[in-house]
């Protein structure tokens, strides 16, 4: 099994005809994803050939869902239009909304988050992102930009704030493989949290152990630690990026900033280790520990 995404997922791409959208749609097709179309109101009724497939372009998410039965949408639209694209997909009742776009205004994401949490979300849409690499269930489907050749299917569940650390961890543990790897994004507000992914991996019978990657800024890792204590029985190994980050300086992601004693890597490490999660110093050490755990299960 897997979480959120599998071989039966039917994917549309909002912004499929743009430069990044067309490039990554091609790569998703090559990964085995069931891409059933795209959305661009100005090009409705046309089609584009990507990855050897002739993909229809629809005028709206609602039309695309009616015609194709799509249940996943991947968003590749400019930051200024991302909020509207998300709300359109939510109104249409899409099951999973994967927002790749970086640079979305925090206020816009907050409004989308509130919309997701409100009565308008009748379809109970789950959003991943924004500013994320998306989600991959190796050997089955990719909704996002994660290189699908890094690792195959296996027993590890991976949840990470960082895209590049997602890729590195998958490479480090390619000998074991992954049930699902999900990059939740590094912005201050995201649709799916560490806790959401931990709960899903705990419920997934094919996930035997979990790698959780965090970074400086906010308190998501501390809240995840509190959740792990009472709810997660599977082994969890952690890595927190940013032990040497200077105070007050944003480090790559909009949410990766230390203010005083708040959001430090040390505080996150302490919280996680207090509930039995071993937090390693490097990605390689994290992979080595996970490998040891799996060999002893």
Mark where each language-model region is.
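Catalytic-core regions of core metabolic enzymes
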Residues: 1-297
């Amino acid at each position: 099994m897997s979480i959120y995404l599998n071989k039966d997922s039917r994917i549309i791409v909002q912004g499929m005809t743009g430069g990044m959208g067309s490039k990554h749609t091609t790569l998703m097709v090559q990964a085995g994803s069931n891409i059933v179309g795209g959305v661009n109101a100005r090009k409705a009724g046309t089609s584009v050939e990507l990855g050897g497939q002739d993909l229809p372009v629809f005028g709206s998410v609602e039309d695309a869902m009616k015609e194709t039965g799509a249940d996943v949408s991947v968003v590749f639209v400019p930051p200024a239009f991302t909020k509207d694209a998300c709300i359109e997909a939510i109104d249409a009742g899409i099951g999973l909304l994967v927002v790749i776009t970086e640079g979305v205004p925090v206020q816009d994401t907050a409004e989308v988050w509130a919309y997701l949490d409100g009565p308008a979300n009748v379809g109970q849409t789950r959003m991943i992102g924004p500013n994320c690499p998306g989600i991959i269930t190796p050997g089955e489907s990719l909704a996002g930009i994660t290189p699908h050749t890094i690792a195959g299917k296996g027993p590890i569940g991976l949840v990470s704030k960082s895209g590049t650390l997602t890729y590195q961890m998958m490479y480090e543990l390619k000998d074991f493989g992954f049930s699902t790897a999900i990059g939740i994004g590094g912005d201050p507000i995201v649709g799916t949290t560490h806790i959401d992914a931990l709960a899903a991996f705990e419920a997934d019978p094919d996930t035997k152990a979990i790698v959780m990657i965090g970074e400086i800024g906010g308190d998501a890792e501390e809240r995840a630690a509190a959740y792990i204590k009472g709810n997660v029985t599977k082994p969890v190994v952690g890595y927190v990026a940013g032990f040497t980050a200077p105070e007050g300086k944003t480090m790559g992601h909009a949410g990766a900033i230390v203010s005083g004693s708040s959001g430090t890597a040390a505080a996150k490490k302490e919280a996680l280790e207090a509930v039995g999660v071993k937090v390693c110093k490097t990605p390689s050490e994290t992979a080595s520990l996970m490998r040891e755990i799996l060999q002893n299960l």
